[in-house]
Amino acid sequence: MSFSTETKNELARVISGNECCNIAELSALVKSGGSIQIVGYKKLNLKITTELNSIARKVFKLLKKNFNINTTISVNKNQMLKRNNSYVLMVTSEMGSEMLLKKLGILEDKEGFFTINKISENLIKHEGCKRAFIRGAFLGGGSISDPEKNYHMEFVTNNEEFADSLKELINSLGFNSKIVARKNNHVVYIKESEQISDLLSIIGGHHALLSLQNTKIVKEMRNNVNRIVNCETANLSKTVNAAVRQVENIKLIQETIGISSLPENLQEIAKIRIEYEDMTLKELGEMLEPPIGKSGVNHRLRKIEEIATDLKKKS
């Protein structure tokens, strides 16, 4: 099961105790996942389609609880395409679809029916209603990426005016959502992990929030470990290359002018370096008598390198 599906299943279980919040959520669900069918003069059917049984059950409960509408859930099987089943709820004109759509702020009756694309201000007067509306919009047309891959939460609609209105609502709560056109749709999206976490929290996706944060922590730890390993690998490679170069310098001196021609302090470090090629500068310094520090060893080896460089130029 995808992270997006898990999140939707969790949010589908959230039922507000306030009627106003339920109506706001149902309005968003219908705007995002519903369609209106004209079946006669001033007669409409409302069709709500979803791929998740949990969302279908939630719509069924909200219709029954807040509007006393008893509808049925039918299942469309997609056997040939091997895709998920889709669940369809139909509210007919006889059931009161026109009354429902008016109360949801979707339909206006002015010498004929007109659909309202903007979010009705009457539906989102209270903070809880705003959160419920966003939750409904996500359940109706939203998705969220697996945090293992990237951070992306979006709300898809085919209506530009509704997309603008939804973006304004989300941003009124302190977020920075944006809109992008995708084929024939308009997508309201958020990409920052912190903002996605906060939005999940206010719409009731607490388990999804914890899962996202845990995944983020693991990713950051993994990245830190990789950085440390890469850094240590680079340092080790640098140390090995330096040791190889130092030994080559000493062998060149040995084959040309002889190590005995070097000052006594350089002879001492040269003999130890060529005998113990794998030792660190610190370990080399501890073998000298008297012992010297890492910087002292490095200074002597640089002197040897200068002599070897001069010999190369002369040859």
Swiss-Prot record:
InterPro entries, alphabetized: Homing_endonucl (IPR027434), Intein_endonuc_central (IPR004042), Sporu_reg_WhiA_N_dom (IPR018478), Sporulation_regulator_WhiA (IPR003802), Sporulation_regulator_WhiA_C (IPR023054), WhiA_LAGLIDADG_dom (IPR039518)
Species the sequence originates in: Clostridioides difficile (strain 630)
Annotated protein name in UniProt: Probable cell division protein WhiA
GO biological process: cell division; regulation of sporulation
Functional summary from the UniProt entry: Involved in cell division and chromosome segregation.
Keyword Protein transport listed: no
Claim: Nucleus is one of the keywords in the record: no
Keywords of this entry: Cell cycle, Cell division, DNA-binding
DNA-binding region: 280-313
Pfam name, any one: WhiA_N
Family: Belongs to the WhiA family.
UniProt xrefs under SUPFAM superfamilies: Homing endonucleases
A Gene Ontology molecular function term of the record: endonuclease activity
